[in-house]
């Protein structure tokens, strides 16, 4: 399986999230479950069931993030002017007006940046854009067989 490429900042944020979940959040919810259990009949104890559900969701998130980290490495700095993982790229789909250009961060969904949509580097369009530069026209065959063409109008690394 190919490794996920993450920025140093995202990798560190995810490590901190796992640590907080393991050492602070999950133990606090486990205590909440224990206190609710002491209230008696569990079949009608809403606090108990809510705390168990909360624990399950948080534990699932911890496991998901741990899996991402175990299968990730720090992305190298993108080459200047070339679309790579962690590039911010603006594209114009064929037939669209220039004001309809769309801007994306090429990267993992966990890269979350304010105001930027994420495009996976493993998606058909994301992978086709890798290695291209401003002004390049890129034709892509989508998973459903449809063909689209985009023009790279801006690359920021």
Sequence positions of predicted segments:
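Amphipathic alpha-helical coiled-coil segments
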Residues: 59-73
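Elongated periplasmic alpha-helical coiled-coil
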Residues: 37-39, 71-75
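Non-DNA-binding regulatory cores of transcription-related proteins
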Residues: 75-157
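Helix-rich terminal scaffold detector
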Residues: 1-24, 28-63
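Conserved NTP-handling cores and scaffolds of large molecular machines
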Residues: 18, 22-25, 69-73, 133
């Amino acid at each position: 399986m190919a490794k996920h490429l993450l920025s140093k900042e995202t990798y560190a944020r995810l490590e901190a999230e796992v640590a907080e979940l393991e050492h602070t959040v999950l133990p606090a919810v486990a205590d909440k479950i224990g206190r609710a259990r002491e209230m008696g009949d569990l079949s009608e104890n809403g606090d108990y069931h809510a705390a168990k559900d909360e624990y399950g969701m948080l534990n699932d998130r911890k496991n998901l993030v741990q899996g991402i980290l175990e299968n990730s490495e720090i992305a190298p700095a993108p080459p200047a002017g070339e679309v790579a993982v962690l590039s911010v790229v603006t594209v114009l789909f064929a037939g669209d007006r220039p004001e309809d250009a769309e801007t994306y961060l090429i990267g993992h969904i966990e890269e979350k940046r304010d105001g930027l949509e994420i495009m996976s580097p493993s998606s058909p369009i994301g992978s086709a854009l890798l290695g291209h530069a401003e002004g390049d026209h890129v034709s892509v065959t989508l998973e459903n067989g449809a063909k689209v063409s985009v023009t790279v109008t801006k690359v920021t690394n």
